[in-house]
Swiss-Prot record:
Keywords: Chromosome, Chromosome partition, Meiosis, Metal-binding, Zinc, Zinc-finger. Residues 153-165 have a biased composition (Basic and acidic residues). The keyword Translocase does not apply. The gene is narya. InterPro entries: Zip3/RNF212-like (IPR042123), Znf_RING (IPR001841), Znf_RING/FYVE/PHD (IPR013083), Znf_RING_CS (IPR017907). It holds the Pfam family zf-RING_5. This is RING finger protein narya.
Length: 211
């Protein structure tokens, strides 16, 4: 800590505690008498800048009081602040690095999922083709089964008793010789006998009929 004194007349505050001291905006310490002389010119007697000053006492703002505090305390604060900010930067960098790692991991997983999707799509295409082949195979065998059933049903009709009797009759008729068949003259005489018989029966039925 330095000794507070006037930068113009070098008067010390400890030797003249009753004399007020001021801190100018240009960072100069001026005692009350020197400030009174310079206030007429409204310029700092040391650097010539516009004179604006605040009295040095316990009521001055913290931003002004820090100029009169022990610099070691500020050095410790600076170290703490520097360490805190360095830790925060390191944490931020670590978080960014982990985000990059997570991004790379997500990228690898996405590539794996894309490959898996391509494989699954290929399997789907193969399964669809296999299903189509199975449907064709099933349709072919169903048609073959229907044709077999139709053939069996047609064969059963040929083996019925009526069909057998008609078949045997046609075979026996076709096997007769021409000599066994009646001649045309015999058929005509048989027809004449039948007609005469019908006439006689009709005449006997109408004997007692009168108009």
């Amino acid at each position: 800590m330095f000794r507070v004194h006037c930068n113009k007349c070098f008067r010390h505050r400890k030797t003249d505690p009753a004399v007020p001291f001021h801190l100018t905006q240009c960072r100069h310490v001026i005692c009350g008498p020197c400030l009174g002389q310079s206030s007429l010119e409204k310029n700092c007697p040391l650097c010539g800048q516009v004179l604006k000053a605040i009295q040095i006492n316990r009521d001055m703002p913290t931003s002004v009081a820090n100029y009169f505090a022990d610099p070691l305390r500020f050095q410790q604060i600076y170290r703490k602040i520097s360490k805190f900010q360095a830790d925060q930067r390191a944490s931020d960098n670590l978080g960014f690095y982990r985000q990059l790692q997570q991004l790379e991991q997500n990228k690898r997983q996405l590539e794996g999922f894309c490959k898996m999707e391509a494989q699954l799509n290929q399997k789907v295409v193969e399964e669809k083709k296999r299903i189509a082949e199975l449907r064709t195979y099933i349709a072919y065998h169903e048609n073959a089964q229907r044709m077999t059933r139709r053939r069996h049903s047609a064969g059963e009709r040929f083996h019925t008793p009526e069909f057998k009797e008609a078949w045997n009759t046609s075979i026996s008729t076709s096997d007769k010789s021409p000599s066994d068949m009646p001649s045309d003259s015999s058929r005509r005489s048989a027809d004449l006998d039948t007609q005469s018989t019908r006439r006689r029966s009709f005449g006997s039925d109408t004997k007692g009929f009168r108009l």
